[in-house]
Every structure is written in C-alpha cells, then in structure tokens.
Amino acid sequence: MRIVSGRAAAGVVKKLASRGAELNRLEPRVRRIVDDVRRDGDRALRRYALRWDGLASKQPLRVPEAEMASAWKALAPELRKSLRQAAQNIRRFCEWQKPRTWTRTRGGISLGQLVRPLESVGCYVPGGRHPLVSTLLMTVIPAQVAGVKQIRVASPNPPAEVLAAASMLGVLEFYRVGGAQAIAALAYGTESIPRVNKIVGPGNAYVTVAKKLVSFDCAIEFLAGPTEAVVLSHTGTPEFIAADLVAQAEHDPEALAIFLTTSRELARSVAANATRLAQGNPTAQESLRRRGAILVAASREQARQWANLIAPEHITVAPEDLPFIHHAGSVFVGDYAAQAAGDYASGPNHVLPTSGQARFRGGLSVTDFVKVITVQRLSSRGLRAIAPAVECLATAEGLPAHAESIRVRYERA
C-alpha cells in the first residue's frame, strides 16, 4: 500500500470525497435488458438466465421448497450451527431496531404513528466470486422482523449453502435468476415472478444500474457499489489494522481500503503487514494496489475530518474517536471489533451505503421494510385550540377553502 502525506494526502481525500458510482456507461445496455423483461416476461427472463446464469433449458425458475430443504439437511453440522448463531444475532438486533406504534394526547388532540410492514419485497443475493449466504440473512431477516408477508429471493445459480440458509429462514419463494433481468422481474413482474413493492440487496454494476432504472416504479434501499474500508488509528495493532483492510479488499478489485493515521511508524508497519497478509490473494493484492492507500494526517483532528469527508461504508476507530464520526455506514470500535464480524454474525446489517451515500443514510435495517403512517384525532376542544392559527395561515397562503373547512367545524362545536 502506498503511504501518502501532506498536500498529496489531502488531495486523495478530496478526490475520495467527490467519488460516485460510475454507472452511466452501462445504462443503455441495462435499459435494453429491463425493457425486454418488462415486455416479454418469462421468455426474456429465461433467455438471459440460459445465457448468463447457467440455467438448464427445462429447469424451473422457482426453486422447489424440497430442494431447499434437502440442501439444509446435507449441510455440514458446523455450518448449520454457524448459520443459526448468525441468524439469531441478526434477528435480535433487528428486534431492537424495530420502530413502534405510539400515541400521545394533549389538550384534546391525539397524535401518533402506525407502523405497517410493506406487503412484498424482493431480496437480491449476488452470485459471482463467492456464495454470499450472509447476504441472504441480512436481507431476509429484517424483512421478516418487520412483518413482510411476501418475501421473494432472487439469486443466479444459487449454491447449496444459500438454498440451505433460505430453508432455515423459511423462505418460500426463491428464484434462480440474477443480474439486471432479476431486478426487472421483481420490479415489474412476469408470469412466474409477481412484482414486489421494494427491492433490496447488493449486486454487480448491472444490478446497480437496473435498480436505478426501476426505482421510479419500485422502491429500492440505495445503490450499493464496491465495498469500502477505512481504519482510523494512531496507536493500534498493525496486524489487526492490516487484516481488516485486506479482508475488505478481497471482495473486489475495485474495493476501497484506506488507513488514516498521524503515525508514520504505524503507517510503515501496517503497509508491511498488508503486503504480507495479501500474499496468495490476487483480488486483495490488485485492490490494494489500485485503490488502497495509507494517508498520514498532520493531527488527530485532521484525520477525523478526513474520515467524515470520505464517509465510508465501514470504519474502524478507537473509542475516543467515536464521538467525532458523523458519516459512515457502520462503525467498529476498538482492536477486537473486526469488520468481518459485522459482515457475518455480530448482528448489525452488512448491506451498507457506499460511494459517499453514508452522508445521508445508514445501512439496511428493519425501517427499510415498514411504512410509518401518522395519525391525528381532534376533539372539538382540540380543534378550537388551534383553529385561529390554522385560519390565519390558510388566509396568508390565499387558500380560503382551507380556512372555511376549519370555521364550519368550530362554529358548530
């Protein structure tokens, strides 16, 4: 990893702060796929699945429940135990996060909110280099805790581990389709796949562009790009820091791995450890070479400022730095809070905002699967208390019918 300091380091941060997802070049190609599926339904979906997902010509798009159950039965006992533990921790955290219905009454006015689950969601589980069974847990469990009744999972050529996890969670609808075509099917529906209210889950650039295109007709959580890891430390353990950077770098050659520090000695040690730990891991090596950097700040305040400007997906900090972090998808505190723990089993979600989106939202949560509906009930006493203010404001805005709708009520009250 390169070590950068002074104005050059500030320049790197400035460039990172203005980063965004490079999606425009793919848009025409992805739009054709989305339009094909929207127009031709299963015929287009199966054509793309045959070409890109390895689907057999007569293989059903929907995975039978028996196939998922068989995958669970065949799973190694140790992996079953690990999946159960991870699912339990994720579910518990989701229960803590769940927004509540409430009502407050004062002066004849009762106000509150209703929390209602979405009726249907699509959970996308990417294929690619690794079978991301953890993404199935992270997308399905919060939807279940929220109370979503119709949960549809889509994944290209799903491996046995993913099908097994789906069986463990009680998933009933699982479709072996992926890419932009899967997003289009979930958003608009086909003969085999009913449309959903919202689509969540990460994917490759084609999936991300497809989510962007369908977002005018179907809700999405956000557009997720390549993974990002930042570590902010001045006295930490070099091997631990390097291990976190390499762990996230192995996801993708485009993954971002940044270490922020004021210590040149620690910078050199982390660089050496990262080189050592990335040996034999070509993806991590390429990622660290292309998008990895160690930035040496002039002060702790500057390092904190840089962290917030980058607004990363993951960031590891010392306890004393936590109060100063305002923009991040997920924060890991202390030497033993490995970022991989959050990727799998500690409980918080690993579907997190990238490309600077952490400036305005957090990661996937139960709140993404519910609607908060406000409720208000006014007695005649309550209406009288606010009627003058409402009439005055309505008149000021030039909306006399608004004012009259108040007046006709309190005159009879």
Residue ranges: model-predicted function:
Residues 1-8, 173-178, 294-299:
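Short acidic-hydrophobic, aromatic-tinged amphipathic segments that line or gate anion-handling sites
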Residues 104-165:
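Conserved small-residue-rich beta-alpha loop and adjacent elements
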Residues 247, 251, 259-328:
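A glycine- and small/hydrophobic-rich beta-loop-beta segment
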Residues 138-149, 167-169, 187-193, 211-213, ...:
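Alpha-helix C-terminal capping segments
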Residues 1-119:
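N-terminal Rossmann-like NAD(P)+-binding subdomain of aldehyde/semialdehyde dehydrogenases
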Residues 170-256:
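Conserved NAD(P)+-binding/catalytic subdomain of aldehyde/semialdehyde dehydrogenases
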Residues 300, 305-413:
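C-terminal core of ALDH-fold dehydrogenases
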